[in-house]
Amino acid sequence: MSPQEDSNPHDPLWLQMCAAADLDPLRRLQARQAVLRHPQAQDCTLYRPDEDDYEAEEEELGDARVLFVGAFEPPSDWDEAERLAYFDDCDPALFFSAYVECAAAVGTAAFFMAEIGDHVASMTADGQVQMHFVHDCSESEQGLLCVLLRDDQPLF
């Protein structure tokens, strides 16, 4: 998979998304391109569960690139109760910070943005499928930074 080239910061959809998040479209696009081109970014596929039927098959959103930047570190001003609520009985070691960018060009029908609840499937170095869940995300001019919760259950 190779990311699509999209260097038009004036695309109407891009301008609308950046305006809604109060972001500079050019800076945000540069950050997006940096993630897509980063040598350590991994190819992945995103899936979105059906909000109305959790037993239904997830919708395949498409290809993306994920750039893991490290273990998730909760803000230093969080108290113990906030940390417990955020991790919700999950092992904090399973939470990672990562930038996620859709491989499709902005403005195309294939373009999407990762959202809380999406599933991220990537391949490990040994060829195993690794699943993560988008637990949280925030968009800034540095990109779409997501907190991913690794699914530690084997797929097969």
Predicted features along the sequence, with ranges:
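Short, solvent-exposed beta-strand/turn "edge" segments of beta-rich domains on protein surfaces
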Residues: 33-35
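Short, Lys/Arg-enriched N-terminal segments with co-localized hydrophobic residues
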Residues: 21-22
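Short, conserved turn/kink motifs that form compact alpha/beta structural patches or helix kinks used as
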Residues: 2-17, 28, 37-40, 47-156
